[in-house]
């Protein structure tokens, strides 16, 4: 099909638009999805959010296995969705292609880098959408757009046929606004049946809440209280020993060094044009020296080991997804960088450093703006987290 779905939303790619019909029947029969423009589709060029990228790359020979799995399960792909440039942003404002409309808060940004996928689900154009998450590129747009998002365990779902970003942290994720669909997509991509919820203990990450804006905390506190009442066994822990800012520094150093290692050849050869924010981040990434990288790696090994062993399979860690509601469209780049990106990544880096699965579930502020509450599980506990989503979203107290 040549038609771009709901073009006024600005969520879909036009230059390399492609739609695919289901290849078989299965649990996703009759459902529609969209795919972030980092997944390869045979016979089509992947755009990666930058016109110079698409211009300097040829059509792909194979389709990413995750896309094939969804088509095999009966879902139809309606199109590719916009991404931030080289996926190196959490804002969702693309200098070249514009900003998709956030249907949950139209005067605010959708978040990124899986901006088009989140906007397509929030705008009810598709039932679910594929994204990728490294530093928060599914979890943050999910809450800005008032929908559900998941980052699975690192290496749990193949990233073959997906443009690499920072492989130490890259995962495939997805969005949905319906909890049952959210879970069904998980069953297909994780190749595991749905399970009944198994939570013995809810753990509150108490060091994360002081980072959160008062208007967000005001909504989250009563929800936390109702969760504490629901799960009899709860405890509070200082998950980072008050070192979240340090953890973020480790995360961004490794992430930046891997992005630069992956992209420097192409940048030096083609001198692509980058928009504000992306350009500065890439310039900074190019300056990270080998000594800093090895320091970050040795710290990372220690943090990763601690986080991997932090939770039992039947324990869930609860924390805010982001410190603030989505900023207004057109917010100045420096404000975005300091108040939104850096502060959000202090929270988002926890699951990344641990390679842990995390879901974000939507709530709203007193003024009706979307925000989110997150749950992190032990490695491989995605189906339990998805069961939690199903269990909670249909409860009046949540």
Regions flagged by a language model, labelled:
Residues 1-126:
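Gly/Ser-rich catalytic/binding loops embedded in alpha/beta enzyme cores
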Residues 31-51, 253-299, 362-369:
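Short helix-loop capping/hinge segments that flank enzyme active sites or metal/cofactor-binding pockets
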Residues 33, 187-256:
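Gly/Ser-rich, acidic/histidine-flanked active-site/gating loops
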Residues 35, 77-82, 130-132, 236-237, ...:
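General beta-strand structural signal in soluble alpha/beta enzymes
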Residues 36, 291-398:
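Glycine-rich, small-residue loops and helix-cap segments
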Residues 217-237, 264-269, 293-314, 342:
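Acyltransferase
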């Amino acid at each position: 099909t040549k038609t771009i779905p709901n073009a006024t939303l600005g969520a879909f790619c036009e230059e390399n638009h492609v739609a695919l019909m289901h290849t078989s029947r299965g649990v996703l029969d009759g459902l529609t999805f969209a795919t972030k423009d980092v997944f390869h589709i045979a016979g089509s060029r992947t755009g990666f959010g930058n016109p110079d990228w698409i211009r300097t790359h040829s059509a792909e020979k194979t389709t990413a296995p995750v896309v094939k799995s969804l088509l095999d399960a009966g879902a139809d792909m309606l199109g590719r969705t916009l991404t931030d440039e080289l996926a190196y942003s959490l804002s969702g404002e693309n200098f070249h292609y514009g900003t998709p409309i956030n249907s949950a808060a139209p005067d605010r940004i959708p978040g990124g880098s899986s901006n088009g996928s989140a906007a397509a689900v929030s705008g009810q154009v598709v039932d679910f959408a594929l994204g990728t998450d490294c530093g928060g590129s599914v979890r943050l747009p999910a809450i800005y757009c008032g929908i559900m998002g998941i980052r699975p365990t690192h290496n749990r779902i193949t990233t073959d046929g997906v443009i690499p970003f920072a492989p130490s942290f890259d995962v495939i994720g997805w969005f949905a606004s319906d909890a049952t669909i959210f879970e069904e997509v998980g069953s297909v991509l994780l190749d595991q049946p749905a399970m009944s919820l198994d939570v013995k203990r809810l753990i509150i990450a108490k060091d994360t809440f002081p980072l959160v804006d008062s208007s967000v905390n005001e909504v989250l506190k009563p929800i936390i209280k109702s969760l504490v009442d629901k799960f009899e066994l709860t405890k509070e822990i200082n998950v980072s020993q008050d070192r979240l800012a340090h953890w973020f520094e480790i995360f961004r150093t490794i992430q930046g060094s891997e992005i630069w290692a992956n992209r420097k050849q192409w940048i030096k050869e083609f001198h692509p044009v980058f928009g504000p924010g992306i350009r500065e981040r890439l310039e900074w990434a190019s300056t990270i020296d080998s000594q800093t990288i090895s320091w970050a790696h040795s710290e990372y090994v220690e943090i990763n080991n601690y986080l991997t062993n932090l939770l039992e399979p039947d324990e869930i860690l609860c924390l805010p997804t982001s410190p603030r509601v989505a900023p207004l469209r057109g917010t100045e780049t420096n404000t975005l960088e300091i108040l939104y990106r850096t502060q959000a990544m202090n929270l988002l880096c926890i699951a990344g450093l641990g390679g842990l699965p995390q879901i974000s579930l939507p709530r709203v502020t007193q003024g009706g703006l979307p925000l989110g509450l997150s749950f992190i599980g032990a490695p491989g506990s995605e189906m339990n987290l998805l069961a939690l989503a199903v269990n909670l979203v249909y409860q009046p107290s949540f």
